[in-house]
């Protein structure tokens, strides 16, 4: 699994001009599921994201987690994170999980994040979505589960 996470002061996602998910202070997660991913990777990623200390404390130091600030999370599925652009001019999506597997792990990740105490809003899986955000910082990180690092997958 791969995720791009952004610290936001607000973020939202629309489908067909209608807002389907929106958060205020928190994290926007763009989540890509790859072949071979399992609930183990989803657990690792959810734990990492909710506990990652990327919010500033009173001294201005990144020392607080999403749990600490009682923030929200907007999860948006994005299969293009599994894209490989190393050859040619058209990305290959050979490593992306099939939709029927990806949706299960995406929904599992969302549920796990809820279990960890974070309110979650979502986009709609496989929909054409318009995502808007105000990146706070800007602060953006790319996370890969340990399994992806071991496989040596790179975009």
UniProtKB/Swiss-Prot annotation:
GO annotations of cellular component type: cytoplasm
Protein name: D-aminoacyl-tRNA deacylase
Pfam family of the protein (one): Tyr_Deacylase
Purpose: An aminoacyl-tRNA editing enzyme that deacylates mischarged D-aminoacyl-tRNAs. Also deacylates mischarged glycyl-tRNA(Ala), protecting cells against glycine mischarging by AlaRS. Acts via tRNA-based rather than protein-based catalysis; rejects L-amino acids rather than detecting D-amino acids in the active site. By recycling D-aminoacyl-tRNA to D-amino acids and free tRNA molecules, this enzyme counteracts the toxicity associated with the formation of D-aminoacyl-tRNA entities in vivo and helps enforce protein L-homochirality.
Subcellular location(s) per record: Cytoplasm
The keyword NAD belongs to this UniProt entry's keyword annotation: no
Disulfide bridges in this chain: none
Assembly and interaction partners: Homodimer.
GO aspect biological process, one term: D-amino acid catabolic process
EC number: 3.1.1.96
């Amino acid at each position: 699994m791969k995720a791009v996470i952004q610290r936001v002061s607000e973020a939202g996602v629309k489908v067909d001009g209608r807002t389907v998910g929106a958060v205020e202070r928190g994290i926007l997660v763009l989540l890509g599921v790859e072949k071979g991913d399992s609930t183990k990777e989803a657990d690792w990623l959810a734990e990492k994201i909710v506990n990652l200390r990327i919010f500033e404390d009173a001294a201005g130091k990144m020392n607080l987690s999403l749990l600490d600030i009682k923030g929200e999370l907007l999860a948006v599925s994005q299969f293009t994170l599994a894209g490989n652009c190393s050859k040619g001019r058209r990305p290959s999506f050979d490593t992306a999980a099939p939709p029927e597997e990806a949706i299960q792990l995406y929904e599992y990740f969302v549920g796990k994040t809820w279990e960890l105490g974070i309110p979650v809003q979502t986009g709609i899986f496989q929909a054409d979505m318009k995502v808007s955000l105000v990146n706070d910082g800007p602060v953006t990180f790319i996370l890969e589960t340990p399994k992806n690092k071991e496989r040596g997958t790179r975009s």
